């Protein structure tokens, strides 16, 4: 099962890639539109979930949870309906990629930083900022140097990320973003010519881009 919030602006590329590969391997795969679907029956004794209207066209599927892998796409976190479906699959016993707590932690950059610190994973020094006083204090706590990185707490693919070269720009950019209600953090600038994205499990690299 793939939980995703499909809308007019999204072609759900990753979901379709997973579905295509499942079809090639003769594995049943169903994309569930969390904006349209609902759970019509949760049979704890049988270990099944009956999900109605999974595609907005009245399709109804019964999932046997012990044999169900549930992929969760980021759009599911945007509203309570998506979160409720995610929690229902997880609590009913489906194998989740990823769990609700894992998704919410990764969706918030400060929460992710705190998790890295707790598990002794090296990461650039980071501080939350909420007003001009906290801004200047945070800048000192992460080293007091320029340039520095300012980020919104949520966002992907570089959206909401700024490289700040001076104190004047630091205050100006923060004030501009606060006017729109943005939650912000400051992060130590690390100079590299390139970056690598990897998936690491138990010290072993499983994939990279």
Question: Which ranges hold each PLM region?
Answer:
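Phosphate-binding site of ATP-dependent enzymes
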Residues: 159-209
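ATP-grasp fold ATP-binding core
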Residues: 116-117, 142-159, 181-193
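Short acidic/polar capping segments at secondary-structure boundaries
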Residues: 101-103, 130-135, 153-157, 167-169, ...
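Generic beta-strand structural signal
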Residues: 98, 128, 200-201
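Conserved N-proximal alpha/beta basic substrate-recognition cap immediately N-terminal to
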Residues: 6-125
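Structural detector of well-ordered beta-strand residues that form the stable sheet scaffold
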Residues: 96-97, 124, 149, 185-187, ...
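Short hydrophobic segments within beta-strands
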Residues: 3-5, 201
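Rossmann-like NAD(P)H-binding beta-loop-alpha module
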Residues: 122-145
């Amino acid at each position: 099962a793939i939980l995703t919030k499909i809308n007019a602006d999204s072609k759900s590329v990753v979901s379709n890639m997973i579905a295509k590969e499942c079809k090639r391997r003769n594995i049943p795969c169903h994309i569930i539109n969390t904006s349209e679907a609902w759970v019509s029956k949760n049979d704890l004794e049988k270990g099944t979930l009956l999900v109605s209207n999974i595609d907005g066209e009245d399709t109804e599927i019964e999932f046997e949870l012990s044999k169900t892998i549930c992929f969760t796409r980021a759009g599911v976190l945007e509203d309570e309906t998506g979160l409720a479906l995610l929690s229902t699959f997880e609590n009913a016993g489906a194998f989740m990629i990823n769990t609700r707590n894992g998704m919410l932690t990764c969706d918030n950059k400060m929460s992710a930083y705190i998790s890295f610190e707790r598990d002794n994973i090296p990461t650039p020094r980071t501080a939350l900022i909420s007003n001009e006083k906290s801004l200047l204090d945070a800048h000192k706590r992460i080293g007091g140097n320029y340039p520095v990185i300012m980020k919104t707490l949520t966002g992907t693919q570089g959206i909401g990320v700024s490289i700040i070269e001076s104190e004047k720009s630091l205050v100006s950019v923060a004030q501009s973003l606060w006017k729109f209600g943005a939650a912000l953090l400051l992060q130590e600038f690390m100079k590299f010519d390139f970056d690598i994205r990897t998936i690491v499990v138990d010290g072993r690299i499983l994939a990279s881009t």
